[in-house]
Amino acid sequence: MKFCHIAPVPHLDLVKKQSTHLTLAHIAAEDNEYCAFYQEQAKRPQTINIMDNSGFEMYKAGMPNFPPEELIGLAKKVKADYIVIPDYPNMPSIVGIDDARRYAPAFKEEGFGTFFVPQSVKGDLEDLILSFAFAASNPLIDYIGISILAVPHAYNCEKGNNLQRFLSRWKFMNEIKARGLLQLAKDNGKLIHFLGMVDGPNEIALMQEFGIDTWDSSAAIWAGFNGVEFDNSPTGLFDGKYEKHVDFQAKIEDNTLVQLAKHNMDYINELVRGINEV
């Protein structure tokens, strides 16, 4: 497994040695320094860049998704290899499926791989599974993203119960494995990515049997910048997810906090070591 730590723009040096990156469309649209950094990263051999559509950030801010046509231009600015197709939290699966059928060919025509995020309305687990099944079997899709929002939504536990939220993606992966859909995805050459992190880094340990290829999160760096250290509790974060939204322009002058962020990154890097290595 490859892990994509995400850093605020003034601290991109923290992630410069990664071989896999997840970039964010809403930052690429506004920050030339950000784009220039990832243009340089693309020159490194065997570096992979997934450009997210910033759907999580736009949803939390109550803003609409980027138009797919604009995503192509932004992906070129950061030299991305894959584009996350627009996804729609708390919407029926067919909305995202229709967009995938419409826009995946255009993304491929421009030379990008395609990344699909299954979604459903809150409480509709079967529709979320249907959405995954579409991606697992459709040749238009290269990558499948397991969302930090979609899965807790499907189990009605996105807010108010950290334990249920922490376990929700583990439960979902077991469900699709039992139905043969995870194997179907692997048989069809799909890559599996985990988007974000919920209530502690030890979620990684729960997922080690599922053949996850890549995972991203800003949790290690952002928690560290705010004085929160990953710990030896069962989840790795005794009080659960640090809920304050990431400020991607934050400049941290206190070196103690920067070192704490590095400690948290090392905690995750040690967890992923040896998982699904090829």
Question: Which ranges hold each PLM region?
Answer:
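Glycine/Thr-rich beta-alpha phosphate-binding loop at enzyme active sites
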Residues: G113-L195, D199-E203, A219-E243
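Alpha/beta catalytic cores of nucleotide-metabolism and tRNA/nucleoside-modifying enzymes
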Residues: M1-P10, E69-I72, I176-I192, G200-V278
